[in-house]
């Protein structure tokens, strides 16, 4: 299993791959492929739980999913995404919630959707041995403020992201997620910091890339413009279910090999 230090050593040397997973089966599949990092994202809210956004995801839901993924993954670094309002209001509560993901559920690190308010928390978590990944740019938990739109389209906001990247690095963040920002800004952030940058809709100059699993394999009904579909699992699943229904309705399933009989039961009445 790679450590945070191993991941940092990859920056600028070898592209870092990160995918989301929300259950043990998916985590096992993703882990077997050799992906470097599995993010148990609060994207589960709209990816698999049927919500319109990530805001309804609870701490207990996240904890359950993190535990499942940690049990399914043997080699990848497992990062727990801290859900909306599970951090930030009170430092002690934030630390307890983040620590729970490592101590009770088996995560290796946590991720915070970041801003000026998370710099001090990142420093404190790092001091306590809780590796922390920062997330800048489009932060879905702020959807009611910013929407799901491109971020840092102007110079002032771009400078703020660059400053926040440096501040979170200084506070001890071990990596940065950069979401839906201009590629040339992401390149400048990557150049400005010594910790890995992992992009999603942020161009190819980041040290790594992350996407949502359901987008990658083609399970999502719709995907953001920066996602790429590499398979059609939704279609394959639908085909398999159609075949199952046809087999049951036609009497082809179950076959004799799918059940057993006991001779002594033949004379029951």
Swiss-Prot record:
It catalyses: 3-methyl-2-oxobutanoate + (6R)-5,10-methylene-5,6,7,8-tetrahydrofolate + H2O = 2-dehydropantoate + (6S)-5,6,7,8-tetrahydrofolate. Belongs to the PanB family. GO terms for cellular component: cytoplasm. It is found in: Cytoplasm. Signal peptide: none annotated. Mg(2+) binds at residues 42, 81, 113. Its main location: cytoplasm. Homodecamer; pentamer of dimers. This is 3-methyl-2-oxobutanoate hydroxymethyltransferase. Residues 252-262 have a biased composition (Basic and acidic residues). One of its GO terms (molecular function) is 3-methyl-2-oxobutanoate hydroxymethyltransferase activity.
């Amino acid at each position: 299993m790679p450590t945070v230090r191993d991941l940092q050593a990859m920056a600028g040397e070898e592209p870092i791959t990160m995918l989301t997973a929300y259950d043990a089966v998916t985590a096992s599949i993703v882990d077997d492929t050799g992906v470097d990092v599995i993010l148990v994202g609060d994207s589960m809210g709209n990816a698999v739980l049927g919500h319109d956004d990530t805001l309804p995801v609870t701490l207990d839901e996240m904890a359950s999913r993190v535990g499942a993924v940690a049990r399914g993954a043997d080699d990848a670094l497992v990062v727990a995404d801290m859900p909306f309002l599970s951090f930030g209001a009170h430092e002690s509560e934030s630390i307890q919630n983040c620590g729970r993901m490592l101590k009770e559920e088996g995560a290796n690190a946590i991720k915070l959707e970041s801003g000026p308010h998370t710099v001090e928390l990142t420093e404190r978590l790092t001091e306590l041995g809780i590796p922390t990944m920062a997330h800048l740019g489009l932060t879905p938990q702020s959807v009611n403020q910013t929407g799901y739109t491109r971020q840092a389209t102007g110079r002032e906001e771009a400078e703020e992201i660059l400053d926040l990247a440096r501040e979170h690095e200084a506070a001890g963040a071990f990596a940065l997620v950069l979401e839906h920002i201009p590629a040339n800004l992401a390149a400048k952030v990557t150049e400005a910091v010594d910790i890995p940058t992992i992009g999603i809709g942020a161009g190819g100059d980041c040290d790594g890339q992350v996407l949502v699993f359901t987008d990658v394999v083609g399970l999502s009904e719709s995907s953001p413009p920066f996602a790429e579909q590499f398979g059609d699992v939704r279609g394959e699943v639908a085909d398999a279910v159609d075949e199952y229904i046809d087999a049951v309705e036609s009497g082809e399933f179950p076959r004799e090999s799918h059940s057993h009989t006991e001779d002594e039961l033949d004379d029951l009445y």
